Amino acid sequence: MIFGTGIDIVDITRFERFLEERNTRLFERLFTIHEQEYCAGKAHSAQHYALRFAAKEAFLKACGLGLREGLTWHDVEVVNDSLGKPDLRLYGKAQQLFADMNLSKTFVSLSHDGNFAVAMVVLERV
């Protein structure tokens, strides 16, 4: 049964500007080391950062919580399987809330066009 859905859209040029400004503190606050390594290794790294940020926002919206209840940006990590399909890996407070809400699965869809990155997250309940 579907528990919640969340969608978010991000302007990729914001992340291009953050990269140009070398705003490392912002990236360290928003993204795990694995996400930073993944994005930095891509030709269009701003696009990949924007997609991951949109996915984190979409997850928070799907939970109906926002960034509260002790959640941090590092509690939600966007990963890809061997075929490139995105998914979420949850840690800390996000993992605990996921279990407390009897959620069983996340579904993630990422897309981009022009200057925009969009993410949708669907949460399934047991």
From Swiss-Prot:
Transfers the 4'-phosphopantetheine moiety from coenzyme A to a Ser of acyl-carrier-protein. Belongs to the P-Pant transferase superfamily. AcpS family. GO terms for molecular function: holo-[acyl-carrier-protein] synthase activity; magnesium ion binding. Mg(2+) binds at residues 8, 57. The keyword Cytoplasm applies. It is found in: Cytoplasm. SUPFAM superfamilies: 4'-phosphopantetheinyl transferase. It comes from Geobacter metallireducens (strain ATCC 53774 / DSM 7210 / GS-15). It catalyses: apo-[ACP] + CoA = holo-[ACP] + adenosine 3',5'-bisphosphate + H(+). Keywords: Cytoplasm, Fatty acid biosynthesis, Fatty acid metabolism, Lipid biosynthesis, Lipid metabolism, Magnesium, Metal-binding, Transferase. Its cofactor is Mg(2+). Gene3D superfamilies: 4'-phosphopantetheinyl transferase domain. Signal peptide: none annotated. InterPro entries: 4-PPantetheinyl_Trfase_dom, 4-PPantetheinyl_Trfase_dom_sf, ACPS, Ppantetheine-prot_Trfase_dom. One of its GO terms (cellular component) is cytoplasm. The keyword Metal-binding applies. Its EC number is 2.7.8.7. One of its GO terms (biological process) is fatty acid biosynthetic process. This is Holo-[acyl-carrier-protein] synthase.
